Amino acid sequence: AASPTYGVPAAVYHDGWAQNGAIVSPHKVEGIELHLRYQGTEAGPLFWAQYSFLGLDPVGLKDEYCPSYFHEMRNLTLVNRAYCIRNPKHYKGFGPDCWGLTASYSVDGYAAHSPNEQEEKGVISPTAALSSIVYTPEYSMQVMRLLYGMGDKVFGPFGFYDAFSETDNWYPQRYLAIDQGPIAVMIENYRSGLLWKLFMSHPDVQAGLTKLGFNTNKQDVRQK
């Protein structure tokens, strides 16, 4: 959007992603309020709350569709956790210290695990909770401690493996780079905000956000 020569028009965002405003659909999932509805779903995999915000700082970020992207993404994370605690399909291991549904390896290949009975398969993806540390630091640390205590079943030379299922006794010792990267980035963003600061300081980023109608209010602080 910020390109001075071939920048896409703001309408690409407003008419495309925001669906002419139809993206705004206040509703509750697991008793938690969400303001937006992506692709017609109530709540999706946790990468929705993470990948866009590895560099783009959600703290205080808002536009005409969402009054606070940080709080929206935090609530999306809390929905994911609450669903795993409720555990309607009674999967082994799910609970307050073991939650996190997102796209990852799965027992039958690869799947976008989400907090609903149609799209979750009893698979916990460590990246889901760990990359959410900017939104739910205490809850994410609880998961990290539990996983670390599970030892080499879920932890290897490059960190936590991509996914596992206690119900299926499935502990593949393999990684997926697109899931590993956000863990390191979001831990550093929680610790120092480094990647957010670097990305947001670029003039092209600021110009693009302005063109698309975003603004920030840093009084909208993170909840520790």
Give the ranges of each region predicted by the language model.
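Ser/Thr/Asn(+Pro)-rich, low-complexity disordered segments
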Residues: 1-224
